[in-house]
Amino acid sequence: MDGNGRWAKQKGFSRIEGHKEGVNTVREIISYCSKIKIKYLTLFTFSEENWNRPKKEIIGLMNLLVKSLKDEKNSLQKNNIKLSVIGDLKKIDPYTRKKIANAISLTKNNDGLILNLAISY
């Protein structure tokens, strides 16, 4: 998931607005992959290099992750999507880790698309 910040800059938006638009695109991709019965989808969400971004942007990205998990949990259930996270989550703040764990737990018995989020990879 690269280029959201550059896209926003080209359009005259803030970087976080670009990331929010990226969430909308990801939602469409996940829906399509589920619809055509793709079994695994891995989204490279937040790399180790992303920790070098300005603190304000990192906080915005983590808040966007939490909001997206909250907003999409019913859709994940409805569409039988199982959430999995790969990466080193030790750097993620405890609140965000808890929300990730809750979403994983909620979808653990789903057996459709397996959605892997690579975070801090």
Describe the predicted segments one by one.
Residues 2-121:
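Flexible, compositionally biased loop and terminal segments
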